[in-house]
């Protein structure tokens, strides 16, 4: 494989990701919840970190950066609009821009909602999008700063990527998300089957990240605001998609 992606558990339920180009040896890190497990994998693989891509400013996604940079003097990328509350950036990124990583195009997507200024990184060559706390496995991030309309727009942008795209989200929340999803979409056979698989995976201490956009489109209630069965279940047949999404998000907040 020209691109290898490793999922690294951090803290209690965070994930960091290493993206390694096998042809050039270049390695990028997406988010830095803590340094120790990331440094361990880099040492085991004898990889030298060349870049760090930050998704948003929350401490559990950036707090290990200083220790990482002490061991690996990598270039740090992040959102220009969030630069005032991120660690020092070498490259400031804006929505719609792209950059080169080891000969692979990486697209920058503003996915505000969880925070304002949250970005995702999409690499078509890797068939991967790194969404952190925007689109999550069977869920989406809580709206700490943005509005429901903003998050719905962000999720809609992500959902428009190719269906085979692997979704690398920032937390292992999937089992709890599945329990909630079944209260919104209880008769969805794909969701029921996926929920059973998640239970088995977690019992075996296996990660449920990544998923695919096709899987999320079929099972994630936060992407399915237009679905007639969900609208009927919520008695919101005549509401807008963003209104249905907002109701689902409100119910999740209280779940």
Swiss-Prot record:
SMART domains: Lactamase_B (SM00849). GO terms for molecular function: hydroxyacylglutathione hydrolase activity; metal ion binding. Keywords: Hydrolase, Metal-binding, Zinc. GO terms for biological process: methylglyoxal catabolic process to D-lactate via S-lactoyl-glutathione. Zn(2+) 1 binds at residues 56, 58, 114, 133. Pfam families: HAGH_C (PF16123), Lactamase_B (PF00753). Its EC number is 3.1.2.6. Pathway: Secondary metabolite metabolism; methylglyoxal degradation; (R)-lactate from methylglyoxal: step 2/2. Zn(2+) 2 binds at residues 60-61, 133, 171. This is Hydroxyacylglutathione hydrolase. It comes from Roseobacter denitrificans (strain ATCC 33942 / OCh 114). The lineage of its organism: Bacteria, Pseudomonadati, Pseudomonadota, Alphaproteobacteria, Rhodobacterales. The gene is gloB.
